[in-house]
């Protein structure tokens, strides 16, 4: 006896030495036979054609360690055959793969396949090397359990009932693994859910692509129409979505008569099932399009104009339709050197001089839409805010505009002329609310005097009576 074993097939040659010519005179040699499948280490001789005598069909033979053949004796023979190892040992239970009980309804089976196929689809699990295998197992399990004929055979015989070496099931068309492309089955089943509460087929299978768009502060605040290049799956322009090469024709599926469904007769039962030849399309593409490879869709570069709504914020995502697909666009808004944003309100700083802060006046400020003349009230303090109503950003989820808040910043000069220093020293002499000291001034109460050692003493004396008149006016303004 000799045996050759592969992962799924076992090839066995069993025999005894051929009878000598003298001993075998008048003895008819066996014509051969067929060894059928049996589990473990048992072989079952189903039929040996001629010369079996009283040893009828299905006589049991046992393979024991030591490569010895024992059991029912028969005429010398040599028989070589191959048989498939039991698929039930190599395959998981289809019900366990889909996570449904054995009495599950077709609706429950389809729903389970829907949810698991979404979870394990290779496009959404690119980092998982086992996702493709799991996805194929789901397709195989669903193909069997969704067909009542195949399901009955599976319940009766298990996976071995579908093997080509086993004819007891009465069906020999199933060959292990899904007979249709798992992707096609996925599209077909998910297409049936397009109007169901489980979601939209296109939103599940073709996940919307995400893009990042850079915007300036003003573009985000005012809105803009911006051109953008996207790569998106759309109808193949070469074959117009038909899948076949232009100038060629698709063949009518003779297996199902173009209906996409085939009829299976199993005794008293007549079942309708998806055509295994064309996958339910009703036609067969013999010359697929060289661009889309028969899918009818191909990735294309498209230049689209995206209307950016006024008031979008940094990190905000919007959904945009592009052809028959949708894309997600996330905005990245650059910081402005002038404005700071708080919702629909904007903030900016306005620098004014000491004289403007004390005496008041006007100043020009940069607004979001135009240059604004701001009225400065006398005596304004640093960091005090001036509110410009309705000069902010449009409210994206409601009506109206935000406000523009101007923060006052008083610019203190780092250098003074002699005249300016004398004026400030004279003003400091009359200050009454100073805590501490002022450089160059000995007393800061009314009637105080400046330090003789100060750099401005000589200049003040040289200034004469004209300066005294100006200082008197300035003091009256400051102390009034």
From Swiss-Prot:
Database matches in InterPro entries: Apopto_cytoskel_mod (IPR051938), DnaJ (IPR012724), DnaJ_C (IPR002939), DnaJ_domain (IPR001623), DnaJ_domain_CS (IPR018253), HSP40/DnaJ_pept-bd (IPR008971), HSP_DnaJ_Cys-rich_dom (IPR001305), HSP_DnaJ_Cys-rich_dom_sf (IPR036410)
Disordered: annotated segments: 437-468
Taxonomic superkingdom: Eukaryota
Bias-annotated ranges (Polar residues): 439-456
BP GO annotations: activation-induced cell death of T cells; apoptotic process; cellular senescence; mitochondrial DNA replication; mitochondrion organization; negative regulation of cell population proliferation; negative regulation of programmed cell death; negative regulation of transcription by RNA polymerase II
Subcellular location field: Mitochondrion matrix; Cytoplasm, Cytosol; Postsynaptic cell membrane
Modified residues (Omega-N-methylarginine): 58, 238, 293
Protein name per its UniProtKB record: DnaJ homolog subfamily A member 3, mitochondrial
Residues that, per the record, bind Zn(2+) 2: 253, 256, 275, 278
Reported function: Modulates apoptotic signal transduction or effector structures within the mitochondrial matrix. Affect cytochrome C release from the mitochondria and caspase 3 activation, but not caspase 8 activation. Isoform 1 increases apoptosis triggered by both TNF and the DNA-damaging agent mytomycin C; in sharp contrast, isoform 2 suppresses apoptosis. Can modulate IFN-gamma-mediated transcriptional activity. Isoform 2 may play a role in neuromuscular junction development as an effector of the MUSK signaling pathway.
KW Iron-sulfur (keyword) present: no
One Gene Ontology term, aspect cellular component: cytoplasmic side of plasma membrane
Subunit-structure text: Interacts with JAK2, HSPA9B and IFN-gammaR2 chain. Interacts with Ras GTPase-activating protein 1 (RASA1). Isoform 2 interacts with MUSK (via the cytoplasmic domain).
Keyword terms, alphabetized: Acetylation, Apoptosis, Cell membrane, Chaperone, Cytoplasm, Membrane, Metal-binding, Methylation, Mitochondrion, Phosphoprotein, Postsynaptic cell membrane, Repeat, Synapse, Transit peptide, Zinc, Zinc-finger
Domain J: 93-158
Membrane topology field: Peripheral membrane protein
Residue intervals of every CR-type zinc finger in the record: 223-301
